[in-house]
Amino acid sequence: MACGPGDLQSLTSPLSSARLDYQPSIEGPWLRACGQTNVSCRVVKGKLVEVGKWPWQVSILFLGTYICSGSLIHHQWVLTAAHCLQRFKDLSLYSVMVGVHQRPENSTQLPLTRMVIHKDFSNLMSQDIALLKLRDSISWSPFVQPVCLPNIKFKPSIGSMCWVIGWGTTGKKG
């Protein structure tokens, strides 16, 4: 793990050909573009951890309990997996927590106003994608920032380094 005090690590943004229907808001010197991390090291329970490595990661809650992760793509929109939302469509049962690192003390829990599940999603995990709209627009901070979305023609080459993030299990129990 390579941690420096507040190191800003730049990731390439594949958004150059994307069309925006709003004027992006740059709210601080630490937000130059999507996909930016603002890593700092902290000791949590005796272990060195990187805080701010994935500032777009959010926790999706069902009745206040974690069920899935998602990614901030806009001030009011979260991208997630459709299978996380397939059992219940009642928005009042869900919320999103932003700014979560190890513990939720410094995070903000937000209600939703809309859920969009891909029209061709099935339990077979085909088209497993959904969007959640937050009731209120959030402000970017060093630890709450948007992820980049790839260009529609983007196709990673075999052997490309990819990251999967979340708070789920990493293997089967037992």
From Swiss-Prot:
> What InterPro entries does this protein's entry cite?
Peptidase_S1_PA (IPR009003), Peptidase_S1_PA_chymotrypsin (IPR043504), Peptidase_S1A (IPR001314), Trypsin_dom (IPR001254), TRYPSIN_HIS (IPR018114)
Q: Which residues form the Peptidase S1 domain?
A: 43-174
Spell out the molecular function terms from Gene Ontology: serine-type endopeptidase activity
| Active site positions | H83, D128
GO terms classed as biological process: proteolysis
- The UniProt record lists the EC number as 3.4.21.-
Q: Which cysteines are joined by disulfide bonds?
A: C68-C84
Q: Which family does the record assign? A: Belongs to the peptidase S1 family.
- Name of this protein: Putative serine protease 46
Species: Homo sapiens
Write the gene name. PRSS46P
